[in-house]
């Protein structure tokens, strides 16, 4: 039986804004929902967007499985500027810093900044 809890549905939406593909994530991102997140991000990357923005505004937690999926997607895009992590909260930012990935990704304070506004 499928569950519709936010834990199981990490992707809140995908939209195109000002030429960028924006993937809005929500809740706790971990081993249990990483496959859905990974699949969605890889599908978006396959569309070769000018910029793929991962909106982390509503994310409360990320684990190493999710960080690995983000690294994989960025590698598929081939450019550090092609994938932007927007508006990570304190816990998410801390996970990126502790893992050293804050130097691997472009990270912006807000979604608007990620969109070049």
Question: What is the role of each PLM region?
Answer:
Residues 31-105:
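Amphipathic alpha-helical interaction surfaces in cytosolic regulatory modules
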Residues 1-2, 94:
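Intrinsically disordered, low-complexity segments enriched in polar/charged residues with Gly/Pro
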Residues 113-114:
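Short alpha-helical segment
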Residues 106-110:
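Short acidic-hydrophobic, aromatic-tinged amphipathic segments that line or gate anion-handling sites
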Residues 2-39:
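STAS-typified acidic loop motif
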């Amino acid at each position: 039986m499928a569950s519709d809890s936010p834990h199981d549905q990490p992707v809140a939406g995908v939209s195109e804004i000002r030429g960028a593909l924006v993937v809005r994530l929500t809740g706790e991102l971990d081993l249990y929902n990483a496959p859905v997140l990974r699949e969605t991000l890889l599908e978006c990357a396959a569309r070769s967007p000018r910029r793929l923005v991962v909106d982390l505004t509503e994310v409360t937690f990320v684990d190493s499985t999710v960080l690995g999926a983000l690294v994989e997607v960025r590698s598929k895009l081939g450019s550090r500027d092609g994938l932007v992590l927007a508006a990570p909260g304190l816990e998410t930012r801390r996970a990126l810093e502790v893992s050293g990935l804050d130097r691997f990704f472009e990270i912006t304070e807000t979604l608007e900044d990620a969109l070049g506004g």
